[in-house]
């Protein structure tokens, strides 16, 4: 189920403060956050946000197409190494 339209998008308050400071100060340094659940707002466009994936912070450059999505969608948590080789095919 999706979030109710009357509630509006969710974004952590501490992340919004960091974004407002970065926009006001014209700072190009990535904003480090652990808030994967926050929705990307139009104010984030043009900023680089370092989203934590459980091991490290992945830099995500925010574009117009990303508005409305969650930050966690762009920082993958699992690394796919490929399926195991078929033993019958090797013979």
Curated annotation (Swiss-Prot):
A GO biological-process term: ribosomal small subunit assembly
GO cellular component labels: cytoplasm; small ribosomal subunit
Gene3D superfamilies, per database record: 30s Ribosomal Protein S19, Chain A (3.30.860.10)
PROSITE patterns in the cross-refs: RIBOSOMAL_S19
Any one GO molecular-function label of the UniProt entry: structural constituent of ribosome
Keywords, in A-Z order: Ribonucleoprotein, Ribosomal protein, RNA-binding, rRNA-binding
Domain of life: Bacteria
Pfam families: Ribosomal_S19
UniProt function note: Protein S19 forms a complex with S13 that binds strongly to the 16S ribosomal RNA.
Family per similarity comment: Belongs to the universal ribosomal protein uS19 family.
Protein name: Small ribosomal subunit protein uS19
Origin species: Cupriavidus pinatubonensis (strain JMP 134 / LMG 1197) (Cupriavidus necator (strain JMP 134))
Gene: rpsS
């Amino acid at each position: 189920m999706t979030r109710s339209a009357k509630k509006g998008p969710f974004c952590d308050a501490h992340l919004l403060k960091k974004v407002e400071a970065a926009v006001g100060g014209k700072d190009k340094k990535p904003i480090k956050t652990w808030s994967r659940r926050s929705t990307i707002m139009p104010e984030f466009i043009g900023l680089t946000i370092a989203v934590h994936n459980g091991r490290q912070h992945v830099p995500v450059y925010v574009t117009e197409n990303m508005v409305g999505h969650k930050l966690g969608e762009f920082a993958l948590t699992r690394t796919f190494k490929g399926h195991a080789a078929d033993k019958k095919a090797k013979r």
